[in-house]
Amino acid sequence: MSAPIVHGGGITEAAARYGGRPEDWLDLSTGINPCPVALPAVPERAWHRLPDRQTVDDARSAAADYYRTNGVLPLPVPGTQSVIQLLPRLAPANRHVAIFGPTYGEYARVLEAAGFAVDRVADADALTAEHGLVIVVNPNNPTGRALAPAELLAIAARQKASGGLLLVDEAFGDLEPQLSVAGHASGQGNLIVFRSFGKFFGLAGLRLGFVVATEPVLASFADWLGPWAVSGPALTISKALMQGDTKAIAAGILERRAGLDAALDGAGLNRIGGTGLFVLVEHPRAALLQERLCEAHILTRKFDYAPTWLRVGLAPDAAGDRRLADALARMEL
């Protein structure tokens, strides 16, 4: 098995290395809404009992409306990482996997560990009939690159002709619903869409995601995960929040993103990509920049495969923006 990937987060470890209390650090290392929404009331029975069929069906129905799946009832899963781990069972055997990259590293790690030949490709021109599974994160993490639905559906059609699959990870898609292909999964036949619940709502600890695909694919994932894969409280919370008005959540995220942009621009940093939930910065001394920010007890995300890149997430408030701006202003790199 390959070595684990170092992801965002890890405030406790950072504090142990650079000092300070974890609660005093400013965590800008993730792509998670830093202003979690207020939790709806969860009935005691959701904690006391195993989730029943009605609870699951209600959450799936709410997800179908929220993700505009055109009749498909999305499968709730305990975080999309849980189904990434299952992809070696789904990917056509003895064929290559193509991953549009650079992107979220767990796809390549899991599939290569299972013995698949993984080709990292820049665009659809690199795809061949050898690719049994094509993976696109859209919008992409960490670059923010976005493919239009027409481009993705063209790839899906090409894959279908060669007996292959297309997986589109829309983990950061809540703020850009016009990019989603979730509504095409039932008609396309070979299209699978992953959606993340926790990033937009600021509830990553809930460990909840959804899969949109044909019924046979959903049945396979459900069988591999086993019964009661998602907790009753998670299902109850997701139903309530997806049925609520999310406009204020989106507006709050965009306001926080504007504050981050201002702090980075004020320091003269080069923004080269991102989504509503993070910015990708290019700097010739990105590793040193990350180190200096850690010394100021501000955590960001660097990338071993791209030493000039730094991903910066959103601060929870204007005070966090000022703290970042002040730390950058004091730096000599």
From Swiss-Prot:
The keyword DNA-binding does not apply. Coiled coil: none annotated. GO terms for cellular component: cytoplasm. It is found in: Cytoplasm. GO terms for biological process: cobalamin biosynthetic process. Its EC number is 4.1.1.81. PROSITE patterns: AA_TRANSFER_CLASS_1. Pfam families: Aminotran_1_2 (PF00155). InterPro entries: Aminotransferase_I/II_large (IPR004839), CobD (IPR005860), NHTrfase_class1_PyrdxlP-BS (IPR004838), PyrdxlP-dep_Trfase (IPR015424), PyrdxlP-dep_Trfase_major (IPR015421), PyrdxlP-dep_Trfase_small (IPR015422). It catalyses: O-phospho-L-threonine + H(+) = (R)-1-aminopropan-2-yl phosphate + CO2. Pathway: Cofactor biosynthesis; adenosylcobalamin biosynthesis. Its cofactor is pyridoxal 5'-phosphate. The modification N6-(pyridoxal phosphate)lysine is found at K199. The keyword Cell membrane does not apply. GO terms for molecular function: pyridoxal phosphate binding; threonine-phosphate decarboxylase activity. It comes from the Bacteria. Keywords: Cobalamin biosynthesis, Cytoplasm, Lyase, Pyridoxal phosphate. Homodimer. Decarboxylates L-threonine-O-3-phosphate to yield (R)-1-amino-2-propanol O-2-phosphate, the precursor for the linkage between the nucleotide loop and the corrin ring in cobalamin. PANTHER family: HISTIDINOL-PHOSPHATE AMINOTRANSFERASE-RELATED (PTHR42885), THREONINE-PHOSPHATE DECARBOXYLASE (PTHR42885:SF1). Belongs to the class-I pyridoxal-phosphate-dependent aminotransferase family. This is Threonine-phosphate decarboxylase.
